Amino acid sequence: MENNFQVFRLISENFSEVSHSIGLNSDFLEANVLNIMLLLFGLIYVLKQFLGSLLTIRQEKVIFAISECEERLQQANNRLLESEKQLEQTQLVITQVLNDAEITAQKVRQSILDKGKIDVEKLIGASKASIVVAENQINQQIKQKITALAIQKVSSQLKAQVDTTMQAKIIDSSIIKLRGDI
């Protein structure tokens, strides 16, 4: 402590040499340093309770705010977990819907292919029937044409071979046959 006084004394002496208007009194009792320190300690003691209660109130508010934030965080985490569960369920539903849609599309495609096969088979059957009918009609027409040509050829040959005497013989034989039948 003695060293401190000496330091103050040196500073005040040096400082007083530099500036005569400002001075440092090294006597504690005259300088009221002791009074200021007592006042300061008294203020600290009195204000300790006041500031302590203010700090306690502030601490309680901070703790309450932190607990509210933690509660909100917990609620947010719960909502997040619930949302994740809903997302998983939604993804499962989407997957199921996509699978069902794919199965339905395959069934529809197979149904269309089966119906197309049946329609093609019907068309083939109808085409075959049409071909058979057309062949029969063509065969009939060919037979009629051949018959007509044969009759025409025979009649032209008969006309060329049959003269008047031959016609008379045919007429006579036909008359005789008719008499015999009667």
UniProtKB/Swiss-Prot annotation:
It is found in: Plastid, Chloroplast thylakoid membrane. Pfam families: ATP-synt_B. It is a single-pass membrane protein. In plastids the F-type ATPase is also known as CF(1)CF(0). CDD domains: ATP-synt_Fo_b (cd06503). Belongs to the ATPase B chain family. One of its GO terms (cellular component) is chloroplast thylakoid membrane. Signal peptide: none annotated. This is ATP synthase subunit b, chloroplastic. GO terms for molecular function: ATP binding; proton-transporting ATP synthase activity, rotational mechanism. The keyword Hydrolase does not apply. The keyword Lipid biosynthesis does not apply. It comes from the Eukaryota. F-type ATPases have 2 components, F(1) - the catalytic core - and F(0) - the membrane proton channel. F(1) has five subunits: alpha(3), beta(3), gamma(1), delta(1), epsilon(1). F(0) has four main subunits: a(1), b(1), b'(1) and c(10-14). The alpha and beta chains form an alternating ring which encloses part of the gamma chain. F(1) is attached to F(0) by a central stalk formed by the gamma and epsilon chains, while a peripheral stalk is formed by the delta, b and b' chains. Its main location: plastid. Keywords: ATP synthesis, ATP-binding, CF(0), Chloroplast, Hydrogen ion transport, Ion transport, Membrane, Nucleotide-binding, Plastid, Thylakoid, Transmembrane, Transmembrane helix, Transport. F(1)F(0) ATP synthase produces ATP from ADP in the presence of a proton or sodium gradient. F-type ATPases consist of two structural domains, F(1) containing the extramembraneous catalytic core and F(0) containing the membrane proton channel, linked together by a central stalk and a peripheral stalk. During catalysis, ATP synthesis in the catalytic domain of F(1) is coupled via a rotary mechanism of the central stalk subunits to proton translocation. Component of the F(0) channel, it forms part of the peripheral stalk, linking F(1) to F(0). The chain crosses the membrane at residues 33-55.
